[in-house]
């Protein structure tokens, strides 16, 4: 309508005037670095929660995200974004930003690779050299293996980081064991716990679009590829078969990171004789959380499926392949 168009234009003009009236500062805004833009629902949920918190503090705050898919990040989150491996793009932003946020997620570990660990440590060191305050936010720490890697990690964090918030106590102990003492360290929680589930109507519509009864009885399984998983897959399938035959629950397999997880979830589903459903991750993390409210039980390897489930009080069981899963369940 005309009134809505006029109202939107007035809002735009007011935003321009408000931002123009702000005093010019030598350094301002936030640059965020994490494993974003890879299609992982857990990492996307972390980013959404961090951005919501920052915008609640100052809706005009300049925010940039280092992403594996900058175009998608700009489109989805309405923030500036540069490629995570383009130092010619992110170094100027480090020089402009007042705060550098490393996290959330398990960035400081070399289970993925020592190259990955060194990359995130290098970005922290660069941000510190550029004059940013450095915060590691909502992080999981470890495992960091190898004495040289542990000493190098402790040296960078002690010299370059101002504040660390952690999602569980196991990470605090890992930092203490490495000798990280200089930053102020607080155990809080994963940022994704702040996300609210989608409305009941939206969740019901999604169920119906996938030929699922919104009032049905379901057990969710969230698997991911991992070394030696094939040796234990039959036990997971037997569990799904048991809850189906004993409690009448339909197994629903969800790929939280579709490009990596879809195949293993399809394989597990194909080993069952009862009806099963295999779903890719939803782009809307809040819809994923809303789905979990309808599950009678959730069995997951993926950490953020466990976090989503706990945020809505859904019964859950973890298949721990990594200390971060064990740490969260203990916390």
Model-derived features: positions:
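Active-site anion-handling motifs in enzyme catalytic cores
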Residues: 19-331
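A charged, aromatic-enriched C-terminal amphipathic alpha-helix characteristic of glycosyltransferases
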Residues: 1-20
């Amino acid at each position: 309508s005309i009134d809505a168009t006029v109202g939107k234009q007035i809002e735009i003009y007011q935003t321009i005037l408000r931002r123009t009236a702000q005093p010019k500062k030598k350094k301002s805004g936030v640059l965020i670095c994490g494993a974003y833009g890879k299609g992982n629902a857990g990492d996307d949920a972390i980013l959404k929660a961090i951005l919501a918190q920052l915008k609640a503090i100052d809706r005009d705050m300049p925010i940039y995200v280092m992403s594996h898919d900058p175009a998608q990040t700009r489109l989805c989150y309405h923030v500036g974004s540069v490629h995570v491996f383009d130092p010619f793009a992110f170094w100027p932003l480090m020089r402009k930003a007042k705060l550098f946020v490393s996290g959330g997620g398990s960035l400081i570990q070399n289970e993925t690779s020592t190259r990955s660990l060194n990359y995130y440590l290098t970005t922290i060191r660069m941000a510190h050299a550029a004059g940013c305050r450095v915060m590691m936010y909502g992080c999981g720490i470890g495992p960091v293996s190898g004495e040289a890697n542990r000493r190098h990690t402790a040296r960078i964090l002690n010299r370059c980081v101002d504040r660390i918030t952690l999602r569980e106590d196991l990470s605090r102990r890992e930092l203490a064991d490495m000798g990280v003492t200089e930053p102020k360290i607080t155990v809080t929680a994963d940022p994704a716990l702040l996300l609210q589930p989608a409305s009941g109507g939206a969740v019901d519509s999604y169920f119906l679009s996938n030929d699922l009864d919104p009032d049905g009885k379901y057990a969710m399984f969230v698997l991911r590829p991992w070394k030696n998983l094939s040796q234990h897959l039959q036990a997971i399938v037997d569990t799904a078969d048991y809850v189906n035959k004993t409690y009448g629950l339909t197994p629903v397999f969800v790929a939280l990171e579709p490009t990596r997880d879809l195949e293993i979830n399809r394989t597990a589903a194909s080993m069952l004789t009862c009806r099963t459903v295999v779903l890719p991750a939803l782009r809307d993390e809040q819809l994923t959380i809303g789905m979990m409210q309808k599950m009678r039980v959730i069995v997951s390897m993926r950490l953020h499926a466990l976090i989503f489930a706990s945020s809505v009080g859904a019964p859950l069981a973890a298949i721990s392949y990594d200390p971060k899963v064990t740490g969260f369940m203990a916390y």
